[in-house]
Amino acid sequence: MARGGDTGCTGPSETSASGAVAIAFPGLEGPPADAQYQTLALTVPKSWSPSPRSLPPALSCPPPQPAMLEHLSSLPTQMDYKGQKLAEQMFQGIILFSAIVGFIYGYVAEQFGWTVYIVMAGFAFSCLLTLPPWPIYRRHPLKWLPVQESSTDDKKPGERKIKRHAKNN
């Protein structure tokens, strides 16, 4: 929670040390001396934590619209087993290649810093290639078994046979 008891609504709100809250209404702008700038001072106890539900209807803000989240939730996030293996091999290969190139360049230039920079760049590049679920990692989708009815529900508890393991002496 931000200083001043910010409720996540648009518009500035500040809390003084005494607990008084000054809330500026979003439609009204201007300096405090301006007649159109209106603030509402509320005295609240320090233990009170403001939430959008506890504010009066005039002060509460509407719920945020998840437009960006709807777009992100439509992206595929799964990766098949062969894709995971390919991503792991690519990750290790790029890291190894950048380490070798970085070591050789750092040795020739006699600058250890360049070795570190090249390895870090290889790590960033490998993360960019392997962490997102690119379509190359989803070429072999899993074939799930169909849902089967449970056969243990038909039998009564007394009809089940108890399997015992033989003792190994």
Swiss-Prot record:
Positions on the Cytoplasmic side per record topology: 1-93, 137-169
Pfam family, one: SPC12
Protein keywords: Endoplasmic reticulum, Membrane, Transmembrane, Transmembrane helix
Name this protein carries in UniProt: Signal peptidase complex subunit 1
Cited function: Component of the signal peptidase complex (SPC) which catalyzes the cleavage of N-terminal signal sequences from nascent proteins as they are translocated into the lumen of the endoplasmic reticulum. Dispensable for SPC enzymatic activity.
InterPro entries tied to this protein: Spc1/SPCS1
Entry PTM: May be phosphorylated.
Localization, UniProt: Endoplasmic reticulum membrane
Membrane topology summary: Multi-pass membrane protein
Transmembrane segments: 94-114, 116-136
Span list, region Disordered: 148-169
GO cellular component: signal peptidase complex
Keyword Transmembrane helix (UniProt): yes
Organism superkingdom: Eukaryota
Subunit structure: Component of the signal peptidase complex paralog A (SPC-A) composed of a catalytic subunit SEC11A and three accessory subunits SPCS1, SPCS2 and SPCS3. Component of the signal peptidase complex paralog C (SPC-C) composed of a catalytic subunit SEC11C and three accessory subunits SPCS1, SPCS2 and SPCS3. Within the complex, interacts with SPCS2 and SPCS3. The complex induces a local thinning of the ER membrane which is used to measure the length of the signal peptide (SP) h-region of protein substrates. This ensures the selectivity of the complex towards h-regions shorter than 18-20 amino acids.
Gene: SPCS1
Homology family: Belongs to the SPCS1 family.
Record topological domains on the Lumenal side: 115
Single biological process term from Gene Ontology: signal peptide processing
